[in-house]
Regions:
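Glycine-rich loop(s) and the adjacent beta-strand/alpha-helix scaffold that form part
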Residues: 1-48, 93, 294, 298-307
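An anion/pyrophosphate-binding glycine-rich loop and adjacent beta-alpha core
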Residues: 22, 31-181
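Structural signal for hydrophobic packing residues in well-ordered secondary-structure cores
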Residues: 26-32, 111, 169-176, 190-201, ...
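Short, small/polar residue-rich loop motifs at catalytic or cofactor-binding pockets
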Residues: 60-62, 248-250, 294
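Short, ordered coil/turn segments that flank beta-strands lining enzyme active or ligand-binding pockets
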Residues: 70-71, 258, 265, 303
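A glycine-rich dinucleotide-binding beta-alpha-beta segment and adjacent secondary-structure elements
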Residues: 178-181, 185-283, 287
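C-terminal, flexible cofactor-proximal segment of oxidoreductases
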Residues: 279-281, 285, 296-314
Length: 314
């Protein structure tokens, strides 16, 4: 399988997070391993109010948006919103029909964006960042989309809002160098999925995932929109979101021993140098393998940092 790197990506970390520390350690004799193990996201959008150059924000999606590739084909199961980012990235970069393109698309309704769009970054979540319970309840349970999400819908260069599918697809095509999407084909795929909500025995994996997610009260209240037809004007307007590949983490890094001391190529300890956190692949040079799980990164930082601190103290 041929994997082609994207020609363009947006940046999900500050400009100073560039891996230069690892290169300095290599020049000093340290060994880096597993540099091919990268953790990037497929749901990146350009920040309309950037803090650093090429600043990207990741959408943390609920399960209901329809996901299309660059030429307008619905992504196959289990490549659904919020499921497996690395499997989706692998699909987008290895399918010969689309590997030349660096983007994909969400198509959704206003009702979906109000309930299911969350954005990465502390500045995009003032309710959580400031531990403001009143704002949290208003934002997550009130009407309309959260303020930061609505701001992206209004100002983001990757967002298209329209009342009809023809108008929507025309706007989406305007965001790419050449028109790649066919409105009739997009509409047919959305209509087919819309109809599955009327089928109590549906085998559509995405529809089943939506129903399953709503069995949990927390998701039903705050995270997953009530099943509805995207093409019903009552649920509009329609929204298209151009998704970019966004950089985030390296799962490899400087190889260390159990005391977080950096090792040389021959396996001996490089005196005076320790590595912890992402610089050490979250521990040792790559504790995760080629995949990982959200929520497991911080633990590796804390544990390897603790080991480094204890080693330095002794």
């Amino acid at each position: 399988v041929t994997i082609t790197p994207p020609a363009t990506m947006i940046t999900g970390v500050p400009e100073y997070v560039d891996g230069s520390g690892i290169e300095v350690a290599e020049r000093a004799g340290g060994r880096s391993v597993n540099r091919d193990r990268m953790w990037h996201y497929t749901e990146g959008i350009s920040n309309w109010a950037p803090i650093w150059p090429n600043h990207g924000i990741r959408i943390l999606p609920g399960p209901s948006s329809m996901w299309f590739d660059a030429i307008g084909r619905r992504l196959p199961s289990p490549l659904l919103p919020g499921f497996d980012t690395l499997a989706t990235l692998r699909h987008l970069r290895t399918d010969p029909a689309i590997a030349q393109y660096d983007h994909s698309w969400f198509v959704l309704s206003q009702r979906i964006i109000e309930k299911e769009f969350a954005l990465s970054g502390s500045e995009q979540n003032p309710d959580l960042t400031n531990r403001d319970l009143a704002l949290l309840l208003k934002t997550r349970l009130g009407s309309g989309a959260p303020g930061p999400v609505e701001a992206f819908k209004q100002h983001g260069i990757d967002f298209v809002v329209a009342e009809s599918i023809d108008e929507l697809v025309a706007g989406m095509n305007a965001l790419t160098p050449a028109p790649l999407l066919n409105a009739a084909a997009i509409e047919a795929q959305i209509r087919d999925r819309d109809l599955e909500f009327d089928n109590p025995f549906t085998k559509d994996a995405q529809v089943m995932a939506i129903h399953n997610a709503r069995r949990y009260r927390g998701d039903r209240m705050m995270r997953v929109a009530k099943p509805h037809r995207i093409l019903d004007p009552a649920n509009g307007p329609l929204i298209g979101v151009k998704l970019n590949i966004i950089t985030r983490k390296s799962l490899g890094g400087l190889q260390t021993d159990l005391q977080s001391r950096v090792l040389r190529e021959d396996g001996s300890v490089l005196p005076g140098l320790w590595a912890a956190g992402e610089a050490a692949g979250f521990g040792g040079g790559g504790v995760h393998g080629y995949n990982a799980l959200e929520g497991t990164f911080l633990g590796g930082c804390l544990f390897s940092g603790r080991a480094a601190g204890r080693s330095m103290a002794h």
